[in-house]
Amino acid sequence: MAVTTSKPRVGWSSIEELEVDLLLEAVYRVGGFDFRNYARASLWRRIQNRLRAEKVDTVTRLLDKIVHDASCMDRFVRGLSVNVSAMFRDPGFFQALRAQVFPLLRTWPYIRVWQAGCSTGEEVYSLAIMLAEEALIGRCRIYATDMDESVLDKAREGIYPLEPIQKYTQNYIRAGGTRSFSEYYTAAYGNAIFRPALRDQVVFARHNLVTDGSFNEFNLVLCRNVMIYFNRALQERVHHLLYDSLAHFGVLGLGSKEMLSLMPLRDRYEELDAPHRLYRRMT
């Protein structure tokens, strides 16, 4: 098995570094999931968590278990995938969408949106609510994608625990919501069940930013808080993918810690709202 190794990180032994390289190569070859260019610091923490969860004491033993046990492979992939999401997360971003991006979307007769790395779907429903309030949802198609089919199943259900709903309500208000947030869900058995109509214009599908290509031309692409887990080479690869997926004058939205200014394609965009990481493709 040919593996490209790199300089050991601080706190890693050279053997651990080699074990991790072999593990990630095996996961790619056997399972088709490519974590080889994820940022190693956060990756190592997640691998350590998997060691404890699987009750093995070395990465090599974890590798053996993953290769010979499909359920262990599934658990490993879920454990390494980043599935942190919330409704109207970063309310200022959604305010900026409403104020600066939606007026641009109105200029297109039909609007295609790509929510890349949608996780369990909270941000997808947040976006659908805002588009509905701006009377845009009827001429939209939202493509919500993730590499993990299990989180896509959760997103398709649109059922979330009631516990964080109070926080989500405050986020909705701060994001400029114009109605009562409770109108969008029904409370039952400790869960908030979101209105099925919110996903009428949503297509949930599996797509891997690391290995898959562009599949449509979009007026708005949101890829937020995903690339912070990638190394520089993979970030550049994904930025090219997002650029290729944008229509001319389409808008790209990134996470608060993700900087377009550090990427090779930065000169092909204009800043719409730099603090909220909103950029418009110009060439």
Predicted feature residues:
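Core SAM-dependent methyltransferase catalytic element
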Residues: L220, L262-T283
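Extended basic-aromatic, gly/pro-enriched interface segments that bind polyanionic ligands
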Residues: R139-L222, V226-L234, L260-S261
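Conserved beta-strand signature within the Rossmann-like core of class I S-adenosyl-L-methionine
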Residues: H248-S256
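Conserved AdoMet
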Residues: A2-W114
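A short glycine-rich, Lys/Arg-flanked "PGG" loop and its adjoining helix->strand segment in the class I
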Residues: E236-H248
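Conserved SAM-binding loop of SAM-dependent methyltransferases across substrates and taxa
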Residues: T120-I137
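Conserved class I S-adenosyl-L-methionine
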Residues: W108-E123, C140-Y143
